[in-house]
């Protein structure tokens, strides 16, 4: 099955659809990435590692994850975020989006059933890449271990409900984007420290008919640490900020991303179109709803 699907998925990722006349913003995002030399080069690299080699009967998981991290760390942020958050209405589009976020080679494990969420969590605590924000965040408090979302103090709930202790602004100066007619991309979207794509705890869309995300794990075999496991998994599955981020992109492209994609402000040459609701998004803080999926420059 992998041998048959690998080349097809590779073509889907690289070429998108032949036409985006129907308003498919995932296709528009793919075409925008293809038109950008750096985005296309980095995207081709991770597609070759994650899908090309998997089609030959193997899954170089470490290389796939490394290429995926490089794509999101070095690619133009507006283009990479557009690929991640584009809304989908059909299974083909949704599967392309899933494979863009975390290809199967880097997401699911070798077995048919997902492991306990404690396994990737423990692995992440030992991984240099996965715990990249530990130094900036101070002592790591176990991802809110022992505190279910319903029992956390109000002060904790008021903070960005992303990966507590991991998702923090970078201490480094964020990269500057090309000047455009609108406001610049906010600093925390450009240069965050957080859980990157291509790690053991990176979430993905759980199916092709919704915008829900979750890591490849469950809590069925977590024993007496079931509460810890559910609290960790809930950071992805019960995250109102994350849900709001996806809904915001479904309503229309945020202006800060449109400015990056079309710096000349010429609608005739813009690869992405924004709906009339996009102006309303200009008055919202998109960063307050991007805590989990903001991706850092690690390499």
Swiss-Prot record:
Spell out the Low complexity composition-biased ranges.
177-198
The record's region (Disordered) falls at 145-198
- Carbohydrate attachment residues: 208
Q: Which Gene3D superfamilies match?
A: GDNF binding domain
What are the recorded Gene Ontology BP terms? glial cell-derived neurotrophic factor receptor signaling pathway; negative regulation of ossification; nervous system development; ossification
Record lineage: Eukaryota, Metazoa, Chordata, Craniata, Vertebrata
Q: What is this protein called?
A: GDNF family receptor alpha-4
Q: What does this protein do?
A: Receptor for persephin (PSPN), a growth factor that exhibits neurotrophic activity on mesencephalic dopaminergic and motor neurons. Acts by binding to its coreceptor, GFRA4, leading to autophosphorylation and activation of the RET receptor. May be important in C-cell development and, in the postnatal development of the adrenal medulla.
Q: Which InterPro entries match?
A: GDNF/GAS1, GDNF_alpha, GDNF_rcpt
A GO molecular function term, named singly, is:
glial cell-derived neurotrophic factor receptor activity
* Propeptide stretch(es), residue numbers: 279-299
Q: Which Pfam families did the record assign?
A: GDNF
What SMART domains does the entry give? Answer: GDNF
Which residues are listed under lipidation as GPI-anchor amidated glycine?
278
Tissues and organs where the protein is expressed, per its UniProt entry: Predominantly expressed in the adult thyroid gland. Low levels also found in fetal adrenal and thyroid glands.
């Amino acid at each position: 099955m992998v041998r048959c699907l690998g080349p097809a998925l590779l073509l889907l990722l690289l070429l998108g659809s032949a036409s985006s006349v129907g308003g498919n913003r995932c296709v528009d995002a793919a075409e925008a990435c293809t038109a950008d030399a750096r985005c296309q080069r980095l995207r081709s690299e991770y597609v070759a590692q994650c899908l090309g080699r998997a089609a030959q009967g193997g899954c170089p998981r470490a290389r796939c994850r490394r290429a995926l991290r490089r794509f999101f760390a070095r690619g133009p942020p507006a283009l990479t975020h557009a690929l991640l958050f584009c809304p989908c209405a059909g299974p083909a589009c949704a599967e392309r989006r899933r494979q863009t976020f975390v290809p199967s080679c880097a997401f699911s494990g070798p077995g048919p059933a997902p492991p306990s969420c404690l396994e990737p969590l423990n692995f992440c605590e030992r991984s240099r890449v996965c715990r990249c924000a530990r130094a900036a965040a101070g002592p790591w408090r176990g991802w809110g271990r022992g505190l279910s979302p319903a029992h956390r103090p109000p002060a904790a709930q008021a903070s960005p409900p992303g990966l507590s202790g991991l998702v923090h602004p970078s201490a480094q100066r964020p990269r500057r984007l090309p000047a455009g007619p609108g406001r610049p991309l906010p600093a925390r979207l450009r240069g965050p420290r957080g859980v990157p794509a291509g790690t053991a705890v990176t979430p993905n869309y759980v199916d092709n008919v919704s915008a829900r995300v979750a890591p490849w794990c469950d809590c069925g075999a977590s024993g007496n640490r079931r509460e810890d496991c559910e609290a960790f998994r809930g950071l992805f599955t019960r995250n109102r900020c994350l849900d709001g981020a996806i809904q915001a992109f479904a309503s229309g492209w945020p202006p800060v991303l449109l400015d990056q994609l079309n710096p000349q402000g010429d609608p005739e040459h813009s690869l992405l179109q924004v709906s009339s609701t996009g102006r309303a998004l200009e008055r919202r803080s998109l960063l307050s709803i991007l805590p989990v999926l903001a991706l850092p420059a690690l390499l």
